[in-house]
Amino acid sequence: MTYTITARKTLTSGELAQIKELVAICNEQDGLDLKVNPGMLEKRSGEHEEDFVCYADGKLVGFLGLYVFHGGEAEVSGMVHPAYRRKGIFTALQAQAADACRRRGIPSQLFIIQRDSQSGKSYMERIGGEYQFSEYWMDLGEKQRATVSGNVLLRPEIASDYETLIWLNVHGFQMEEERAREMAENMAGDPKSTTHLMIVDDKAIGKISVNKDESKAFIYGFCVHPDHQGKGYGRQALAQTIERLVEEGCPQVSLEVACENSSALGLYESCGFFVKSANDYYKLAL
């Protein structure tokens, strides 16, 4: 069998449809819920080679995508058609992706591996990937949610809030300032996204963002400054955000949270979320 791998700076509508179909085939075969960030695939800048496609027998049989939020690492997600596995396709995709990262001076890759993917974990062991953390994808359920009251005001961001948002990213996510600025620039200007500041006593103490379209809303960038954690402010802000989205008629609300263990999910579960899937992240130095 022969196959061809090509690096792409942008993807055509046909390629996007083929990737969607490949994801569905792999998910059905493996009982997984692979994460490929379709929204990011649709909005590639065209500046860098970040998508790698493999064709054999006239169809797409493998895909690997790079997701670069800052210059310190590139997140990696990909898959190979069940009928074309164990033929070196993913290894070849990864080799091209690693070369693309090196050309950009990106020192490491962060692989997104579904918790139940035995093949993914075996691959990480084989190439020396080191476990870093886990993220839990959670959906808002129909059960009764806890009623939360308090003095947190959610205010939409304005242009003059830029430095405050950087400050919150640095302290709320323990992020280096340079990377916080780079991430903010990369994610700015998305018409589907809104960010609200958490205001207590006229001071910004946290933030929460929502990416929304006609069918779903995704909560992200949710943090509280360490000086104000443990006071219930995050719960208040999350509850207010959920209430607003439900009132707006949003049919599906989801979020992704990084936790060292599943017991840390209590805040989100108390607000009506349940765990749909989990991803483990593995780092590979280049």
Residue ranges of model-derived segments:
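Conserved hydrophobic beta-strand within the GNAT/NAT acetyltransferase core sheet
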Residues: 76-78, 109-112, 219, 253-257
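Conserved acetyl-CoA-binding loop-helix of GNAT-fold acetyltransferases
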Residues: 86-99, 126, 221-224, 230-247, ...
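Acyl-donor-binding surface of acyltransferase catalytic domains
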Residues: 70, 82-150, 282-284
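Short amphipathic alpha-helix that is part of the acyltransferase structural core
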Residues: 1-38, 148-177
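Glycine/small-residue-rich hydrophobic helix-like segments
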Residues: 182-248
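C-terminal "cap" of GNAT-fold acetyltransferases
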Residues: 136-158, 251, 256-262, 277-286
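Active-site acidic-Proline motif in GNAT/NAT acetyltransferases
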Residues: 81-87, 212, 225-227, 231, ...
